[in-house]
Amino acid sequence: MYSYVNLKNSTLNVLKQHNKLPSDIKWVGCTSFKIPIEEFWKLADRQYDAGYGGVEVAEDLIVVGDSWWLERHEYDGSEWWEYKELPQEPEKILSVPTLFPKGDTNYEYIRLGDFNEK
C-alpha cells in the first residue's frame, strides 16, 4: 500500500504542531554537514512513499532550532519526523543503585524513576 507524502509539507505540519515557524529553523543537514535552508525547502518539495517498504528519505536528516530538533524515524520502512526538545535539567538529585530493573520486564516501557524512586 502506497502512502505518498510531500516532505516539505510534512515538515511544515510537524513544525506547526509544535508551535514552530520555518523562521525558527537554525540549520538543516546531518551531524557531518549542513545545507542551506532554502536548498532544503526546494529539495523537500517532493512526494515520497512514507508507507511500509524501503526507506526513501535520508535517515540522518535533521532540522535544528534553538533547543529543539526534528529527526527522521523509521519502522519497517514507514517514515516520519519526530520532534525532540532539549530536556530541562531537574533540580532534584537522586543517587540510584541501578540502571536496570529487576526481573522480566516483558519488553514494557520502563522508566528510571519506576524502580529507583521511593
Residue ranges and their predicted role:
Residues 1-118:
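Acidic interaction surfaces
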